[in-house]
Design a protein with these regions (language model features):
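Rossmann-like flavin
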Residues: 91-205
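Glycine-rich FAD pyrophosphate-binding loop
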Residues: 26-46
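Residue-level preference for short coil/turn positions at secondary-structure junctions
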Residues: 4-6, 11, 27, 47-48, ...
Length: 206
């Protein structure tokens, strides 16, 4: 248990740093926030997607990513790029990454990530009660859609989230267009995460 007369330093004035500092203040601690910029500046928290994603508990290093890596590296528009002269320095990290791609390690991470994310929204709500968020946060959920009718491309993710207890709803073609009538009728399957939220402007929140 920490003494209340301690001064606590929090490094980084992004959304995580600001939230950590505020909760420490609410518990009675004196907090100093360190950053090169003022909160709400131009760092990562101002340029993120603005999603509150309680479903996002599955780590990147998972069994099926191993078969995707070669195609990612060879594609000029792929999401993965390497500076080959840096590869020798990356080998220790990459070996640890591969080790954690096992189903056992992936499920271990997903389980505990879910426990953290499950309490994240109530924690945000506690902070948001103290600031004016008029028109900034939408509680409309988020929908992922695919033109693959049997949803095989996302079967692993769906089953993992089902096992750890994440709230999700499978959608058919009709349900997709009931939720979003303006989407082209080429999508046959989807998943809806009702508890997800988004903000219109991440920078204005903190």
């Amino acid at each position: 248990k920490m003494e209340k007369n301690l001064k606590i330093g929090v490094i980084g004035a992004g959304i995580q740093g600001v939230c950590s500092a505020l909760f420490l203040q609410k518990k009675g601690y004196e907090v100093i926030l360190f950053d090169r910029e003022e909160p709400g500046g131009s760092a990562a928290s101002s340029g993120n997607a603005g999603h509150f994603s309680p479903y996002a508990s599955i780590p990147l290093n998972r069994p099926d990513i191993l078969t995707d890596i070669p195609a990612m590296l060879l594609s000029s528009t792929g999401p993965l790029a390497l500076k080959w002269n840096h590869v020798p320095k990356m080998i220790p990290w990459f070996l640890k990454f591969l080790k954690n791609c096992s189903t056992k390690n992936m499920m271990h991470t997903a389980k505990y990530m879910h426990q953290i994310l499950d309490i994240a929204l109530p924690a945000y709500d506690e902070l948001f009660e103290e600031i004016d968020l008029s028109g900034l946060v939408e509680n409309k959920g988020i929908m992922y859609i695919w033109n693959d009718q049997n949803l095989k491309s996302r079967e692993l993710e769906y089953n993992i989230r089902k096992e750890i207890g994440a709230e999700q709803q499978l959608l058919n073609k009709k349900e997709i267009h009931d939720l979003e009538p303006n989407i082209k009728k080429i999508y046959h399957a989807g998943v809806f995460y009702k508890k997800a939220r988004h903000t219109r402007n991440p920078g204005k929140i903190w």
